[in-house]
Amino acid sequence: ARIFNTYGPGMALNDGRAISNFIIQALQNKPITMHGDGKQTRSFCYVKDTASGLIELMNSDLQGPVNIGNPDEIQLIELAEQIIDLTDSTSEIVHQDSAVDDPRRRCPDISQAIGQLAWSPQVDRQTGLERTIEYIKEKLCEQ
């Protein structure tokens, strides 16, 4: 399996990934740090969808690499704006230099998973972000 940008409850808060970084910064009303212009796209797959895709793959006879992810792309600047909105944050977006070797686009082709596993992600980004925000709020309160 090739797994693409999984997020959701249980994710590490300090691993440097966009979703956890943006949510923590937004909840703390700190500037959201954006590498580059923010127009690079990514796709994010909610953890339960990733798990269900892996289970379908394990229960199949399919051989070779299969992409497990969500093909719903979003520009990182739009993701940051959505998180600011969902957290009622006063954070502003601050641009920094682009990361070295940062691809402009990252989106899985999941046609094999759809066609041969009858699998596709079910949790939309807004719902997944809302659940993840609640999880991160709880974790920050524990610290």
Q: For the regions a protein language model found, what residue spans apply to each?
A:
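Flexible, glycine-rich beta-alpha linker
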Residues: 1-16
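C-terminal substrate-binding subdomain of Rossmann-fold SDR/epimerase-dehydratase oxidoreductases
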Residues: 5, 9, 24-143
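Amphipathic alpha-helical segments in well-structured domains
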Residues: 19-20
